[in-house]
Amino acid sequence: MGIRHELDILLVSENLALKNVELLKGDSYGCTINIKVNQQKKLDFIIILRPDWTEVRNVKKINMVCNGVVIDTTLIKKSFYEEVYSSSVTVFQNTTVEFFSDTSKKYKEEYPIVNINTIKRYYEIKDSRMTCINFESPISDYDQVNYLKDYINISDDYYLYDACDDCIISSDDDDDNDNADDDEEDDDEVNDIEDDYE
């Protein structure tokens, strides 16, 4: 069946979880996130990797790049079942954040692309590519209890709160009925985000 790691990315500062970010098959994992902001903003990430040990002896380090600048990721928890990393970056403008284990074009072209508008609290899977990526907002109680308490750089304000009742989440359902699925308001939101990254 092939290697199947599991990768989740928690954008803690937006109370948003990107779940099942891993490739459907292969010893590689990553994601591109386009983030729209209108002011200085601190972005706090928790990256959770659950390795598939059936065919690998070691897992590849998760690298992070923000607008072309390498950002450190800190390993905060490690066990046989998972590796948990944390990272923070302060941005002043629209930003592209990339997470990846491989720099090979072959793999990076299979990583999903996500748009996050922090102003309108709108989240969109622009291209799921070779993944089954999906969103969870707010971050689940399970993830908060198991991961946020280990992230020592995050204040208690992020812990066990529910501030995202008005979030809009969009994803491509691949049912060939996209015109029927999208209403006019959603199209406007998506266009606002995509205009900033083209």
UniProtKB/Swiss-Prot annotation:
InterPro entries recorded for this chain? Answer: Poxvirus_C7/F8A
Q: Name one GO biological process term.
A: viral process
The record lists its disulfide bonds as none
Matching Pfam families, A to Z?
Answer: Pox_C7_F8A
* Annotated segments matching region Disordered: 171-198
Q: Which family does it belong to?
A: Belongs to the poxviridae C7 protein family.
Function (record text): Plays a role for multiplication of the virus in different cell types.
Query: What is the name of the protein in this document?
Result: Probable host range protein 2
